[in-house]
């Protein structure tokens, strides 16, 4: 009888020990999996957050210039122009009023000076690389200020949008920096052939490109 009691006690003890070990192993496995997953998710969320931060437009530096077109050569031209640089691209957006119907040339000129009544105080085309005048992107050459032509309707209103990586705002590259230049609107269209400026006629509007803001 005594031996039977010892045997039963031993079996109970062994069973309790096995149950305890099984629970301990299960707890360790559950705990291990939870820790790994949490750590992985935290790392992933951190990387994702950093990527979103970099991609967030609010974290990208922007340079902007706002300028106003003044009438020249007894025209009635007016307008507002903005230049915005972001991620290596400069976008020019403009809205003009008071222009005659038809084709007009728009160029960047070399000096930010619109003081003269005919706009000639702005100098010639901005051409820092010494190229021949031509249509933008022409393999035979073009000025950095050779934006091109735009059309004006019966209402005298026109909008212009131009985007390029060949300009910059306030950078150290004088072949790209548009600060210190002027926007000139001409009476007629640019033929992209006549030298040195395309035979576009009088300067009917001028806007100085000077101070810029960075945000």
Model-derived features: positions:
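Hydrophobic helical h-region of N-terminal Sec-dependent signal peptides
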Residues: 10-13
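C-terminal motif of bacterial Sec signal peptides marking the signal peptidase cleavage site
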Residues: 17-20
């Amino acid at each position: 009888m005594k031996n039977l009691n010892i045997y039963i006690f031993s079996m109970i003890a062994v069973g309790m020990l096995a149950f305890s070990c099984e629970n301990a192993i299960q707890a360790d496995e559950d705990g291990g999996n939870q820790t790994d997953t949490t750590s992985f998710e935290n790392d992933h969320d951190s990387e994702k957050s950093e990527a979103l931060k970099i991609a967030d437009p609010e974290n990208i530096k922007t340079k902007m210039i706002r300028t106003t077109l003044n009438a020249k050569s007894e025209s009635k031209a007016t307008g507002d122009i903005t230049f915005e640089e972001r991620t290596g691209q400069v976008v020019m957006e403009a809205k003009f009023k008071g222009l005659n119907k038809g084709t007009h040339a728009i160029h960047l000129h070399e000096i930010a000076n619109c003081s003269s009544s005919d706009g000639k105080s702005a100098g010639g085309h901005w051409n820092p690389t010494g190229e021949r005048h031509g249509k933008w992107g022409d393999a035979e050459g073009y000025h950095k200020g050779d934006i091109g032509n735009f059309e004006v309707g019966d209402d005298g209103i026109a909008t212009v949008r131009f985007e390029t990586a060949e300009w910059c705002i306030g950078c150290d590259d004088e072949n790209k920096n548009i600060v210190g230049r002027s926007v000139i609107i001409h009476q007629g269209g640019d033929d992209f052939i006549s030298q040195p400026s395309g035979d576009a006629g009088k300067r009917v509007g001028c806007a100085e490109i000077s101070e810029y803001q960075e945000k």
